[in-house]
């Protein structure tokens, strides 16, 4: 059976007089004095269908029984709309189809929320429960189409660059040094488990050992971790690895890839992209994920703070803390209520308070005015290049607290004062991360244990491992990390040394990574790679508030699927087959 000759966005004045067939959902229904109007909708657009009672009474009576979201196949003739009745907002707004016959393909129950009135705010949990209906509202499908265009462009680009797409296993071995694994019990081997991949990291490195040279994959990955607006338990990444290269070879390819992906949405990205070291990012922006759409750069104020009598400044200086802040142009107009609000805001991130200093026609107004000489205030204004009506905002705290507090504060103020537009795209490579960091007093890998140290820092592995920098690189866009990668360790002895520093016992190394260490010992080429977060990339491209909006069937913030009611209990017979007993 033929359901349509045209899509619902295709008919124009050029088709007037033609007999056509359309299929779609009843978007809106109106009966105006014996004339039935139906907006018929498919994924591509809307066409107005009309039936007049005085011309076709039986057809009119049948059509009058149709309701929202019923699925119809309609035959009829394309006619011009009456003068003054055109709709310039529709591609089909100058025509309508006079119904000759129609067939109801499917009926719909009463809807849990309106499809046609997509401006109405609907509870997100209800939208996720009825995700297939939420898709019909149009916005979700537009985002999924963007995702498709990005994936298609990625595959074409990577193929042209000589990369081979390889699908790596989903059932693998648990190596829980990173986030928690999702585990899959084995029926054939009772008491043993597979793990779903947090990334194809080991497999893609083994492909380099195997001589593939250049690999990529749009990989689905799984991490059992607490969720945020930009995290899901399962997510997609553009996974890339190449042999016989370094960052000078790989990073330009990634920049061209990013420019190609953004071009699918008509966005031009100037190349090359900016670069800054991890330490520069921390010093100037308080974070390794700086949003460069606006300035508000942080500056170290310790040399000025020590010339004050402010006890909080002096206490932080005595205990190895810092005093830093930024200048807000025109911010001297901020009220005391606003400044008190910012003070409470930074306390959420561990700061004890907020120092403010206003430059008002050359005069100083500050909540620490009595603790610092006028001359020092004016030197601070010159240091920050603060003009009349600017304000300085400073925090005294341990370095990590000051950085985190000021990072969040500068983002908040930039948003409130509209210092950037949503169609700005500011990329930056962050390089030279620490190889290790401290977590609860324990040395852990900053990225993952397969990241190579910078060659000049290798001697520090034995004397000061926390000072070792890594040959790693993150790509940050508007404050979001959208890609992360590194040069890999290809020397088995160096890899074993890294595991030892991480306090992974020889027995544990052999159990979890013995196969990998063995592979490295059979002649491994120098190699490096990167993974781009596909969900985050599309989220930015579509200005979505969450990656849930760019995934067809996402989980909630609590990692549940409200539509399928997953996770769910399973039958006792299934548990028995898997030799599993559930205890709470």
UniProtKB/Swiss-Prot annotation:
Subcellular localization(s) per the UniProt record: Cytoplasm
Pfam families on file: GAD (PF02938), tRNA-synt_2 (PF00152), tRNA_anti-codon (PF01336)
InterPro entries in alphabetical order: Aa-tRNA-synt_II, aa-tRNA-synth_II, aa-tRNA-synth_II/BPL/LPL, Asp-tRNA-ligase_1, Asp-tRNA-ligase_1_N, Asp/Asn-tRNA-synth_IIb, AspRS_core, GAD-like_sf
Site (Important for tRNA non-discrimination): 32, 84
An annotated Gene Ontology molecular function: nucleic acid binding
The entry's keywords: Aminoacyl-tRNA synthetase, ATP-binding, Cytoplasm, Ligase, Nucleotide-binding, Protein biosynthesis
Aspartate as annotated region, ranges: 201-204
Coarse class of the protein's main subcellular location: cytoplasm
Gene3D superfamilies (UniProt xref): Bira Bifunctional Protein, Domain 2, GAD-like domain, Nucleic acid-binding proteins
Catalytic activity: tRNA(Asx) + L-aspartate + ATP = L-aspartyl-tRNA(Asx) + AMP + diphosphate
Superkingdom classification of source: Bacteria
Binding-site residues for ATP, renumbered to this chain: 223-225, 232, 481, 533-536
CDD domains on file: AspRS_core, EcAspRS_like_N
E.C. code: 6.1.1.23
Top-rank EC class of the record's enzyme: ligase
Oligomeric and partner information: Homodimer.
Homology family: Belongs to the class-II aminoacyl-tRNA synthetase family. Type 1 subfamily.
Protein name per the record: Aspartate--tRNA(Asp/Asn) ligase
Lineage, broadest ranks: Bacteria, Pseudomonadati, Chlamydiota, Chlamydiia, Chlamydiales
């Amino acid at each position: 059976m033929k359901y349509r000759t045209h899509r619902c966005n295709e008919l124009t004045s050029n088709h007037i007089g033609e007999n056509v067939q359309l299929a779609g959902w009843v978007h809106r229904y109106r009966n105006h004095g014996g004339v039935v109007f139906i907006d018929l909708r498919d994924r591509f657009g809307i066409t107005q269908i009309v039936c007049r009672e005085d011309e076709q009474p039986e057809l009119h009576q049948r059509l009058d029984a149709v309701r929202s979201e019923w699925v119809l196949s309609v035959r009829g003739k394309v006619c011009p709309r009456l003068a003054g009745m055109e709709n310039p907002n529709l591609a089909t707004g100058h025509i309508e189809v006079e119904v000759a016959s129609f067939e109801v393909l499917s009926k719909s129950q009463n809807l849990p929320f309106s499809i046609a009135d997509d401006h109405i705010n609907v509870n997100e949990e209800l939208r996720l429960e009825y995700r297939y209906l939420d898709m019909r509202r149009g916005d979700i499908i537009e985002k999924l189409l963007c995702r498709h265009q990005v994936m298609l462009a990625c595959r074409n680009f990577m193929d042209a660059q000589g990369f081979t797409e390889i699908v790596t296993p989903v059932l693998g071995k648990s190596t829980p040094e990173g986030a928690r694994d999702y585990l899959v019990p084995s029926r054939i081997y009772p008491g043993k488990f597979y793990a779903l991949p947090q990334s194809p990291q080991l497999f893609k490195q083994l492909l380099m050992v195997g001589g593939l040279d250049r690999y990529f994959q749009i990989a689905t990955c799984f991490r059992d971790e607490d969720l945020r607006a930009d995290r899901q338990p399962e997510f997609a990444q553009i996974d890339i690895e190449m042999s016989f290269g370094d960052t000078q070879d790989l990073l330009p390819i990634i920049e061209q890839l990013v420019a190609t992906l953004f071009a699918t949405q008509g966005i031009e990205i100037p190349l090359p992209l900016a670069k800054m070291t991890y330490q520069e990012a921390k010093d100037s922006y308080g974070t390794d994920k700086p949003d460069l759409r606006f300035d508000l750069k942080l500056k170290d104020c310790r040399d000025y703070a020590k010339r004050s009598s402010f006890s909080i400044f002096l206490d932080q200086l005595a205990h190895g803390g810092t005093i830093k802040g930024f200048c807000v142009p025109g911010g001297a107009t901020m009220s005391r209520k606003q400044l008190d609000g910012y003070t409470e805001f930074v306390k959420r991130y561990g700061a004890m308070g907020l120092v403010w200093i206003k430059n008002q026609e050359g005069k100083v107004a500050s909540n620490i005015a009595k603790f610092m000489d006028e001359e020092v205030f004016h030197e601070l204004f010159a240091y920050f290049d603060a003009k009349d009506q600017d304000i300085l905002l400073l925090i005294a705290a341990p370095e990590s607290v000051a950085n985190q507090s000021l990072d969040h504060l500068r983002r908040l103020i930039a948003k409130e004062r509209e210092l950037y537009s949503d169609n700005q795209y500011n990329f930056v490579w962050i390089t030279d991360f620490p190889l290790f960091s401290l977590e609860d007093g324990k040395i852990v890998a900053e990225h993952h244990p397969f990241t190579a140290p910078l060659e000049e820092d290798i001697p520090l592995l034995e004397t000061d491992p926390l000072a070792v920098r890594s040959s790693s690189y993150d790509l940050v866009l508007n404050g979001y990390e959208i890609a992360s990668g590194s040069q890999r360790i290809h020397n088995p002895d160096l890899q074993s040394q890294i595991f030892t520093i991480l306090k992974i016992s020889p027995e544990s190394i052999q159990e979890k990574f013995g196969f990998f260490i063995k592979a490295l010992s059979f002649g491994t080429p120098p190699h490096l790679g990167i993974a781009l977060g596909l969900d985050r990339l599309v989220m930015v491209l579509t200005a979505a508030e969450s990656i849930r909006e760019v995934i067809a069937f996402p989980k909630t913030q609590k990692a549940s699927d409200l539509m399928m009611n997953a996770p769910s209990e399973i039958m006792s017979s299934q548990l028995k087959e898997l030799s599993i007993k559930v205890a709470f």
